[in-house]
From Swiss-Prot:
It comes from the Bacteria. InterPro entries: Ribosomal_uS8 (IPR000630), Ribosomal_uS8_sf (IPR035987). One of the primary rRNA binding proteins, it binds directly to 16S rRNA central domain where it helps coordinate assembly of the platform of the 30S subunit. One of its GO terms (molecular function) is structural constituent of ribosome. One of its GO terms (biological process) is translation. This is Small ribosomal subunit protein uS8. One of its GO terms (cellular component) is ribosome. Pfam families: Ribosomal_S8 (PF00410). It comes from Frankia alni (strain DSM 45986 / CECT 9034 / ACN14a). Part of the 30S ribosomal subunit. Contacts proteins S5 and S12. Keywords: Ribonucleoprotein, Ribosomal protein, RNA-binding, rRNA-binding. The gene is rpsH. Belongs to the universal ribosomal protein uS8 family.
Amino acid sequence: MTMTDPIADMLTRVRNASRAYHDSVVMPHSKIKTHIAEILQQEGYISSWHVDDATLAGGVGHTLVIDLKYGPNRERSIAGIKRISKPGLRVYAKATNLPKVLGGLGVAIISTSSGLLTDKQAGKRGVGGEVLAYVW
């Protein structure tokens, strides 16, 4: 069966692994997932990520491995993560109307003509785009 929303699958895997206090989470690799992981690392929500060759483990293609981040007393760095624009209902935002997550404490991941950006980066560049997810 084909996957209709790989971004939602990625976010769900990260959310579930974080709630279960796993150290890392493995998922199929794609360029957009890599860019989302890069943004999550830049914003301090995950500790690191890397791409493994799945053919060594008997799989096909590459896998993305995300190492989750916790505080000194195992507090989760990701309190919540939510998919906004879905295949059935796309959500777009203009540069003048970019969303703020929890009054600026969280981050919105936006797909723009300049690539994937956070809401703050898109505001500085003056570009809008498709609002993929909120992370707080």
